[in-house]
């Protein structure tokens, strides 16, 4: 049987996430960076979450070639104890 009554329209509530407010673009392409240095800790900290995870490129807008370099640079900085592996020290 067909339903001829009014249908309830569902509203989509979007969650406000600070990573999605701005338009995504590659910071390294805009700055003309050729290679990401593991000693540039201020830049690397922008791409690491509080718990120590590397933020994925789909959230930051980083191009794939720079995301691979960023991944390697963060891992080198962690190995040399320039960056912590986690922020949760007990």
Swiss-Prot record:
Q: Which superkingdom is the protein from?
A: Bacteria
As for family, the record states:
Belongs to the bacterial ribosomal protein bS18 family.
The alphabetized UniProt keywords are: Ribonucleoprotein, Ribosomal protein, RNA-binding, rRNA-binding
Q: Which NCBIfam families match?
A: S18
Briefly state the protein's biological role: Binds as a heterodimer with protein bS6 to the central domain of the 16S rRNA, where it helps stabilize the platform of the 30S subunit.
Organism listed in the record? Bordetella pertussis (strain Tohama I / ATCC BAA-589 / NCTC 13251)
**UniProt record, GO biological process:** translation
Question: How does this protein assemble?
Answer: Part of the 30S ribosomal subunit. Forms a tight heterodimer with protein bS6.
Which Gene Ontology MF annotations are present? small ribosomal subunit rRNA binding; structural constituent of ribosome
Q: Membrane spanning segments where? A: none
Protein name per the record? Small ribosomal subunit protein bS18
Q: Which Pfam families match?
A: Ribosomal_S18
Q: Which gene encodes it?
A: rpsR
Q: List the disulfide bonds.
A: none
- State the taxonomy lineage: Bacteria, Pseudomonadati, Pseudomonadota, Betaproteobacteria, Burkholderiales
Task: Give the HAMAP family listed for this entry.
Answer: Ribosomal_bS18
InterPro entries under this entry?
A: Ribosomal_bS18, Ribosomal_bS18_CS, Ribosomal_bS18_sf
GO CC terms in record = cytosolic small ribosomal subunit
């Amino acid at each position: 049987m067909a339903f001829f009554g009014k249908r309830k329209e569902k509203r989509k509530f979007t969650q406000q996430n600070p990573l999605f407010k701005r338009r995504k673009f590659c910071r390294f392409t805009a700055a003309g960076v050729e290679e990401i240095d593991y000693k540039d800790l201020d830049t690397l900290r922008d791409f690491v979450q509080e718990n120590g995870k590397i933020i994925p490129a789909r959230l930051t807008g980083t191009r794939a070639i720079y995301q691979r370099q960023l991944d390697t640079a963060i891992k080198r900085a962690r190995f040399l104890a320039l960056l912590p592996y986690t922020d949760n020290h007990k």
